[in-house]
UniProtKB/Swiss-Prot annotation:
Disordered: annotated span: 107-137
Location of this chain's protein in the cell: Nucleus
All residue ranges annotated as the RRM domain in the record: 5-83
Catalytic activity: [protein]-peptidylproline (omega=180) = [protein]-peptidylproline (omega=0)
Record keyword Transferase present: no
Organism of origin: Bos taurus (Bovine)
Phosphoserine: residues bearing it: 91, 97, 119
EC number: 5.2.1.8
Gene encoding the protein: PPIE
Subunit description: Identified in the spliceosome C complex. Component of the XAB2 complex, a multimeric protein complex composed of XAB2, PRPF19, AQR, ZNF830, ISY1, and PPIE. Identified in a pentameric intron-binding (IB) complex composed of AQR, XAB2, ISY1, ZNF830 and PPIE that is incorporated into the spliceosome as a preassembled complex. The IB complex does not contain PRPF19. Interacts (via RNA-binding domain) with KMT2A (via the third PHD-type zinc-finger).
Record-given protein name: Peptidyl-prolyl cis-trans isomerase E
Protein task: Involved in pre-mRNA splicing as component of the spliceosome. Combines RNA-binding and PPIase activities. Binds mRNA and has a preference for single-stranded RNA molecules with poly-A and poly-U stretches, suggesting it binds to the poly(A)-region in the 3'-UTR of mRNA molecules. Catalyzes the cis-trans isomerization of proline imidic peptide bonds in proteins. Inhibits KMT2A activity; this requires proline isomerase activity.
Any one GO molecular-function label of the UniProt entry: mRNA binding
Disulfide-bond pairs as recorded: none
SMART domains: RRM (SM00360)
Length: 301
């Protein structure tokens, strides 16, 4: 059946994971038609695994490629195609409600989860409606050394949310490391508006008309799961829907009117004071008072 190519088994789930968390983690890969998290009716807790059904088989395949062996709430999860047993013709009961099926295909996960009991997974606070941040080793961390005029201003350290927007995060990471032969080093923040944002990333024309992504000229909006909830968030600048390149901006304040229009893909973890120094060089029309240069950039490995 074609359905089997669209239903994924997700094992190794932490106790805190629910259908909302799973939906947020898997929706970047395509439309989801159903999420099932089987319960242990004695404990009234889930059994450590779930089933996610995509509308398209290719989206399910993309989810496996990106999510298998990734981390969610401090645990490494396994993601692969579900292997349903044959059930009686005409039955509308999902195969994963059958105890024999569960014993056959979920036993390993249940045992592993029992072994891990006693070591509580770290609690992660998130903005309402946003997925939890994975451990720092799963999400890349990058930095930019900033120079204002001729003086060093300090370093901005950023966490990239590859758990939510892997394509957008990878583009930015590569532009920080220059591993594709081009990137941000030596480019400027060409547009700075106090109490709004600081925009940079045009390393070709240096005025907001250029730049390019590692995928070619432009790439599509990946998703709008993360929101512009406050200062220090990293988001893609664009010239309309699906026109992402290399230009980005750092928010100086909450900018929720940009939600659904610009892809948020990271946040400052250290160096918010440096962002405030950049912001101080701005003006109402966006023209910087002094040159603000990315003198160096790279990835923490």
């Amino acid at each position: 059946m074609a359905t089997t190519k669209r239903v994924l088994y997700v094992g190794g789930l932490a106790e805190e994971v629910d259908d909302k968390v799973l939906h947020a983690a898997f929706i970047p890969f395509g439309d989801i038609t159903d999420i099932q998290i089987p319960l242990d009716y004695e404990t009234e807790k889930h059994r450590g695994f779930a089933f996610v059904e995509f509308e398209l088989a290719e989206d399910a395949a993309a989810a496996i490629d990106n999510m298998n062996e990734s981390e969610l709430f401090g645990r490494t999860i396994r993601v692969n195609l579900a292997k349903p047993m044959r059930i009686k013709e005409g039955s509308s009961r999902p195969v994963w409600s059958d105890d024999d099926w569960l014993k056959k295909f979920s036993g390993k996960t249940l045992e592993e989860n029992k072994e891990e009991e006693g070591s509580e997974p770290p609690k992660v606070e998130t903005q309402e409606g946003e997925p939890a941040v994975k451990k720092a080793r799963s999400n890349p961390q990058v930095y930019m050394d900033i120079k204002i005029g001729n003086k060093p201003a300090g370093r901005i350290q950023m966490l990239l949310r590859s758990d939510v927007v892997p394509m957008t995060a990878e583009n930015f990471r590569c532009l920080c490391t220059h591993e594709k032969g081009f990137g941000f080093k030596g480019s400027s923040f060409h547009r700075i508006i106090p109490q709004f944002m600081c925009q940079g990333g045009d390393f070709t024309n240096h005025n907001g008309t250029g730049g390019k992504s590692i995928y070619g000229k432009k790439f599509d909006d990946e998703n709008f799961i993360l929101k512009h909830t406050g200062p220090g968030l990293l988001s893609m600048a664009n010239s309309g829907p699906n026109t992402n390149g290399s230009q980005f901006f750092l928010t100086c304040d909450k900018t929720d009117w940009l939600d659904g229009k610009h892809v948020v893909f990271g946040e400052i973890t250290d160096g918010l004071d440096v962002l405030r120094q950049i912001e101080a060089q701005g003006s109402k029309d966006g023209k910087p008072k002094q040159k603000v240069i990315i003198s160096d950039c790279g990835e923490y490995v």
